[in-house]
């Protein structure tokens, strides 16, 4: 009940919102992001701020989440993020770092998207090494999520560049990719989304 939670790169804050709904913490979980998502959940505290800047505050937490965000950091900034996160954990506090599984990833892609995703996942593997070296004592877990999504919604997600590997693609490339997905899939798209989780305990 008294746990303090911070979600770095929270997006819409779905995870901490679900935790708050279930456990009703006295301190509302805090979600930070450099982009204010218009659909951010209302039962958490959202702050639009850079993670490194926020972690320089002396506030302590029992749980810090970093979900699918590491690829936005340079090596130097990632090490700084990890060092600050460790400092901000209470005794017995946990740091959870989530990222996409890098091998045999099943996310439905068009050709250009696949190339960008593979490049991003290759870099993630390198970043995992930096994380392991910095945190030293960690445990790895994998979570499988069965996804069933309508083709219409998935096309909207691609068009909105909801998946970060799409951010660098030109509009023409995205539009061509939309046509590829339209031809490749019927009404519903089914796949298994696997997340890797690195756990550090203070």
What function would you assign to each model-found segment?
Residues 4, 93-94:
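Short glycine-centered segments of the SAM/dcSAM-binding site in methyltransferase folds
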Residues 6, 11-54:
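Class I SAM-dependent methyltransferase SAM/SAH-binding core
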Residues 65:
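A conserved beta-strand element that flanks and buttresses the S-adenosyl-L-methionine
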Residues 68-69:
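Short catalytic micro-motifs in class I SAM-dependent methyltransferases
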Residues 79-91:
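A short glycine-rich, Lys/Arg-flanked "PGG" loop and its adjoining helix->strand segment in the class I
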Residues 96-122:
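Conserved class I S-adenosyl-L-methionine
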Residues 120-134:
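Short alpha-helix
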Residues 139-202:
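Conserved Class I S-adenosyl-L-methionine
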